[in-house]
Regions:
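Soluble catalytic domains of membrane acyltransferases
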Residues: 54-130
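A transmembrane-helix-recognition feature enriched in membrane-embedded lipid enzymes
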Residues: 2-60, 112-113
């Protein structure tokens, strides 16, 4: 069964995720450049939840009722896996901005979409400046 799951992830899930990511990035770039970092949260949630759905990753969220969407917070993800970004993005009710290494800005479409959405790129080459 595990072999079938891995085959599904690479042969079906991954190509679909690449297409969803491209579509979402292009949609964000074209439709929301004037929003000054305020691309609709629905676009971000759609992307995150779609990725996890196509990878067949179950998500169980507890304690969301303790998070006030109108209050400011600092969320810190400790990267237990590559999927924590999607889980946080898709299931936290707050409209937040990621801090990410500046190298991610160079990813075609995705880097531009992140900039349009108002995410923050950090230059980690000089720890004092970062």
């Amino acid at each position: 069964m595990k072999v079938l799951y891995i085959l599904y992830q690479y042969l079906i899930g991954l190509p679909i995720i690449i297409l969803i990511t491209l579509f979402t990035a292009i949609f964000t770039i074209i439709c929301f450049p004037w929003k000054n970092g305020k691309a609709p949260r629905a676009v971000q949630v759609f992307w995150s939840r779609s990725v996890l759905w196509f990878l067949l990753v179950p998500i169980k969220v507890t304690g969301r009722e303790n998070v006030n969407p109108k209050q400011s917070y600092v969320f810190v993800a400790n990267h237990q896996s590559a999927l924590d970004v999607f889980a946080v993005y898709g299931w936290l009710p707050n409209n937040f901005k990621w801090m990410m290494k500046k190298e991610l800005r160079k990813i075609p479409f995705v880097g531009t979409a992140c900039a349009v959405a108002g995410h923050i790129f950090v230059d980690r080459s000089n720890p004092r400046a970062a």
